[in-house]
Amino acid sequence: MDANLRRKLDELPAEPGCYLMKDRAGEVVYVGKASSLRSRVRSYFDAGRGDQRAFVALLDGLLGDLEVIVTRSEKEAVLLENELIKKHRPRFNVRLRDDKDFIVLKLDERHPYPRLEVRRAREKRQPGARYFGPYSSASSIRETLRMVNRHFQLRTCSDHVFDHRKRPCILYQIHRCPAPCVYEVPAEEYRQSVEDAVEFLEGREGELVERLRGRMAGAAEGLRFEEAARLRDQLQAVERSLEKQRVLMSDRGDRDVIGLYREGPDLVVQVLSMRAGKLQDAQAHPFREQEFPAEEILSSFLSLYYEHTDAPDEILVPLEPVQAEALADVLSERRGRRVRLLTPQRGAKADLLDVARRNAEQGFRAWHEHDERREQALASLAKALHLARPPRWMECYDISTFQGALAVGSGVSMKDGEPDKANYRRYKVKAVAGQDDFAMLHEVVTRRLRRALGEGQLPDLIVIDGGKGQLNAALAAAKDLGVPTRPSPGNPDAPFVELVGLAKSRLVDGPALGTARVVARRGRRAEARLADAAEAAEKGFVSELARSPERVFLPGRKDPVVLRQNSAELFLLARLRDEAHRFAITFHRKLRRERNFQSVLEEIPGIGEGRKRALLRHFGALRRVREATPEEIAQVEGFGPRQAAAVHAFFHRPDAPPAAADEPSGAPEGTPAGGPAEAIPDAAIAATEAEIDAALADEDASPEPAA
């Protein structure tokens, strides 16, 4: 240990605070907290204790500097540690998924007819609103929304649509919503549905079942059979939900049970969420390179995890976390009620801890098996594509344009087989006029590689969405910048990036393929040439047309490589390519919408660029501006009654053009990176999991730096 570091250790104060350990390059590798900085930090280097823990030996060769921040209390140290971990993202601290990946259900009870909205967990919580969650997967929130909206019949439309709707939507026709937006639904009746939904979401199904049974019997006695049938369906749905939940405790309390399993530097923290004595949810959180003591890891995890979800009455933990009392105070303050951290040694609660530990071990095994399959897929991909190394860091680039207008490029990143959304980028094509995909790709790849050279980091593999022509354009960009695309024989450690092109499957025809089978809607079958099949498809037939496989083009090779269908290697590439396509087309649609918005507003006298941007930010779509009242427009930044009246009069004059057929009726599909969180469009509720993930991806990328 150098003299400067030894001096800092000798001068550490015996006060509460946080410490930041840095490596020899000055990067923060660990953040910790302590009630006494002197005691905690010196314990890592106390040779007299004969400490053989792995992290002690690790620090001796890694640590380059130490920084401490003194706080006024232990509770303040807990809060500061949380912020420092999120800011520096240290290598050896537990790091939960980015909080924008977690989603919650919000119920604004200030509205007379509230609805459930999907929100990001990091959104500032509003007074008067209730939050349920967080949900870490799209499938779980989709199932919950489907259940609640179907059986408790809460409205799904946004407040803006609610205020302006003139006739009920299809949900009213199929008896999924009472249409309070159009009809006079008694507020007390709707409020009862809201209370039922809240009890269901909070896990208090027992109370709900008893009340539903009573109301159903009352409706039947009053000969209100339609109401009784609706209540019966609600009751059956709740009872089916109860059958899926395992009762683990008889006291019907709310508690989370934390399990921890560790092998070497890798560990899994398991959270079993119990509400009213029943197991409601189970989440496994895997972490790598966790060399520090388990009590420190657990303390950091609890502080981060309960930042965006309400802590229950009790949290059962397998060991006492660092500064447990201060941590409990922080969690209680966030919740507004007392939260207890307990470490039971015997009895039913100790048995729950054992269940959580065994679940953590099972999660650990599944996590490592997944890692092994991913490693095999990357190795197989490298072998199939003749790559110099397994592509642990892959990027894919795609172009989206409409007849050469508003051309944009997208770059998505994948590390170790998982999306790396911090490195997603959007590009506006600047130097190419007209429809020239090759030149556009050349520009986008040039800008990407120029930035990579400045940062000193190159991905292992760049995948181009396209065939041989698109690949050659990207290779030319690399050559122009002097970026090697193969390892140097004389200097194997020199950086390089490999490039391939992935061409989509396509309809094919030819003598070798014979004919394509065409299946009619009513089960009839016919044989037709491919040209006839296309005509038949237009007339309502579904054609099973022959398609070529996905093809991978390699530099310097005439024929493409065809990967085995349904293989893990092809799945990795196709998943990366499809994500690049989604990201590009979403950005293109956003720009096209903004252009259409601006072109219409240019005709309004007295509305400058600043007010146009303010309208776009506030309403998001032309249709919303058309439907807005002068009072609503006046609420936009920079608008007064006079400007609001001018905008309203422009859209409601006798010769005003009708709304375009494709004019969006909801919020923009993508918001600028780092922009405010939007409610997920209602249509996403019934969509596939992939579509909901896309709806949640409005903030997944950083803006592309100026080239």
Curated annotation (Swiss-Prot):
Instruction: List UniProt keywords, sorted A-Z.
Output: Cytoplasm, DNA damage, DNA excision, DNA repair, Excision nuclease, SOS response
- Which InterPro entries does the entry link to? DisA/LigA_HHH, GIY-YIG_endonuc, GIY-YIG_endonuc_sf, GIY-YIG_UvrC_Cho, Hlx-hairpin-Hlx_DNA-bd_motif, RuvA_2-like, UVR_dom, UVR_dom_sf
Where in this chain does the record put each UVR domain? 206-241
* Compartments in which it is found: Cytoplasm
List, as start-end ranges, the regions of compositional bias called Low complexity: 658-684
Which parts of the sequence belong to the GIY-YIG domain?
A: 14-94
One GO molecular function term of this record is: excinuclease ABC activity
Instruction: Please list the disulfide bridges.
Output: none
Domain of life of the source: Bacteria
Where is this protein primarily located?
cytoplasm
GO process annotations (BP)? nucleotide-excision repair; SOS response
Region spans: Disordered: 654-684
Q: Where is it found, in Gene Ontology cellular component terms?
A: cytoplasm; excinuclease repair complex
Q: How does it assemble?
A: Interacts with UvrB in an incision complex.
NCBIfam families for the chain: uvrC (TIGR00194)
User: What is this protein for, i.e. what is its function?
Assistant: The UvrABC repair system catalyzes the recognition and processing of DNA lesions. UvrC both incises the 5' and 3' sides of the lesion. The N-terminal half is responsible for the 3' incision and the C-terminal half is responsible for the 5' incision.
Which protein family is named in the record? Answer: Belongs to the UvrC family.
Name under which the protein is recorded: UvrABC system protein C
Organism equals Anaeromyxobacter dehalogenans (strain 2CP-C)
Taxonomic placement: Bacteria, Pseudomonadati, Myxococcota, Myxococcia, Myxococcales
